[in-house]
Swiss-Prot record:
SUPFAM superfamilies: Interleukin 8-like chemokines (SSF54117)
Keywords of the record: Cytokine, Disulfide bond, Growth factor, Inflammatory response, Secreted, Signal
Record's GO cellular component terms: extracellular space
S-S pairs: 40-66, 42-82
Protein name, UniProt field: Growth-regulated protein homolog
Location, primary (coarse class): secreted
UniProt xrefs under Gene3D superfamilies: 2.40.50.40
Location(s) in or outside the cell: Secreted
Matching InterPro entries: Chemokine_b/g/d, Chemokine_CXC, Chemokine_CXC_CS, Chemokine_IL8-like_dom, CXC_Chemokine_domain, Interleukin_8-like_sf
Residue ranges of the TM segments: none
GO MF annotation, one: chemokine activity
Lineage: Eukaryota, Metazoa, Chordata, Craniata, Vertebrata
Single Gene Ontology BP annotation: immune response
Amino acid sequence: MAPAATAAAPRLLRAALLLLLLVAAGRRAAGAPVVNELRCQCLQTLQGIHLKNIQSVKVTTPGPHCDQTEVIASLKTGQEVCLNPTAPVVKKIIDKMLNKASAN
């Protein structure tokens, strides 16, 4: 082999090993779950909203992302608002939405 080819061999080997390491790390990360948000979504809440304006309600229980119960209402206008889960009006809304869903 020529001296130039011999000097390039370690660099080529190093580049190939680095590429192999990156490919292996990428495959391992591909199977990991993806978490969208690691914080609470509701920074401000409403005490209530009229039931006729609500399309659906999503209740998120406390977990690693947030230590509070979150109630997110999707309105018929397409907007989403956060509701105070401890407000009496919100508790009634959740009960009505659950009863409506179980009746269907």
